[in-house]
Amino acid sequence: MGVYKFCYNKKKEVGQVAVLQKERLIFYIVTKEKSYLKPTLANFSNAIDSLYNECLLRKCCKLAIPKIGCCLDRLYWKTVKNIIIDKLCKKGIEVVVYYI
């Protein structure tokens, strides 16, 4: 099952997070209505808030994430990074950003 179908089946809307739990937790943040659209900063920020809440719920205190919101989504990394710092790192979630 693809990511889109997985999130669709979970009935997740923009600003929410779909969670897949097998050997490890995988969080899919929903930042836009369609894959070809650009997310707004408000939707991105709301999705990061939802990610924080899911981390609390599942006692997850460390995340490894790609450079989300950039590249195809065309958000500025400096802005995205500040949202991640304010909404995750300053609240006790350790975040490691990796590059693919």
Swiss-Prot record:
It comes from the Viruses. GO terms for biological process: peptidyl-glutamate ADP-deribosylation. InterPro entries: ADP-ribose_metab_enzymes (IPR050892), Macro_dom-like (IPR043472). SUPFAM superfamilies: Macro domain-like. PANTHER family: ADP-RIBOSE GLYCOHYDROLASE OARD1, PROTEIN C6ORF130. This is Uncharacterized protein 032R. It comes from Invertebrate iridescent virus 6.
